[in-house]
Amino acid sequence: MAIIHPKVRGFICTTTHPKGCELNVRDQIEATRKLGVREDGPKKVLVIGASSGYGLAARITAAFGFKADTLGVFFEKPGTETKAGTAGWYNSAAFDKFAKAEGLYSKSINGDAFSDEARAKVIELIKNEMGGKVDLVIYSLASPVRKLPQTGEVIRSALKPIGEPYKSTAIDTNKDTIIEASIEPATEQEIADTVTVMGGQDWQLWIDALAGANVLAEGARTVAFSYIGSDITWPIYWHGALGQAKQDLDETALRLDQKLADEVKGGANVAVLKSVVTQASSAIPVMPLYLSMVFKIMQEKGIHEGTQNQLDRMYRDRMYRADGAPADVDEKGRLRLDDWELRDDVQTACKALWPQVTTENLFELTDYAGYKKQFLNLFGFERADVNYDEDVATDVKFDCIEL
């Protein structure tokens, strides 16, 4: 038991609130349920990177929008008697509790999703507990490091531009001030390493392993999540080291799509999602300012979406359409869920607003207050229905295998 308040260091909140996290998950489940439960669609789903952000939302839509059995893989820190674990641990515990209450199969693996050990354990569980096959594999890993399974070598990714140093207006989120951020370009090695960590290699290893073990159902699909963003963030993102990794992901999708079409009459896509507040996005310089602006503009236009709305739209309007029609894809075969964010009217408004923002008018011109609240929400804080001065149980156990 502990009384827990937020402690923010840099772009990380070092504390989490178990009750707040549980209520966040409950709200996401309710949002999905409101759209109705479908009888068709995926029924046995593996989510790699299932504990927060888009991966968690994908697991929630599968379970509570389509009554699917789910297996989730993630790397989180459990809580102890005296110390809280990570938000993803409590998110997953809450998901497990609500899924089991519905009579759905829910199992989780806490370990390194980049490891062969994790793949072997997943295959064993699919064979022994999930009827032998899965029909959807969601790949949603966001990690700054990857340990290569063959050699044990640890590779790190770099959030850097390519070629030129990147200079831009940004928010110092610790002081709530507007600053000039400057980031030196990535070296060739850093670019290559970023592709190794965040590109399609591990996704390919997963699908190869699952296909090799014959645990992919007829018609099985796989989706990996990506972000392209607007040209405002391109120097640091799409045209930076991370963009190279995401282009590698695109190329991997084309290979996997062919493979799955040939082997199980299935398919693979990259899904390009909109920018949202996640632990991953808050680490990207310029993102907090861009998010604060684009949220305000999209809210004014009535087209703002959170993580759960995006995934509900991906499943219901793209992958598993009620009319059975194939999903709309772009010229690279990608599912585009960033279509509303990238509308001309939204981006033009962003570009007009960008040079006007100062420390003095930051809260007035943008939804930076909303950004800050959503950031703390990720860790279970800033909820009106939680008393943060009360003791809360931190040692939460659930149906999770520790690797």
Curated annotation (Swiss-Prot):
The keyword Transcription does not apply. InterPro entries: Eno_Rdtase_FAD-bd_dom, Enoyl-CoA_Rdtase_cat_dom, FabV-like_NADH_b, Trans-2-enoyl-CoA_reductase. It comes from the Bacteria. Substrate binds at residue 227. One of its GO terms (biological process) is fatty acid biosynthetic process. The record marks 76 as: Plays an important role in discriminating NADH against NADPH. It comes from Pseudomonas putida (strain GB-1). Pathway: Lipid metabolism; fatty acid biosynthesis. It holds the Pfam family Eno-Rase_FAD_bd. NAD(+) binds at residues 49-54, 75-76, 112-113, 141-142, 246, 276-278. Its EC number is 1.3.1.9. HAMAP family: FabV_reductase. Transmembrane segments: none annotated. The active site is at 237 (proton donor). Belongs to the TER reductase family. Involved in the final reduction of the elongation cycle of fatty acid synthesis (FAS II). Catalyzes the reduction of a carbon-carbon double bond in an enoyl moiety that is covalently linked to an acyl carrier protein (ACP). This is Enoyl-[acyl-carrier-protein] reductase [NADH].
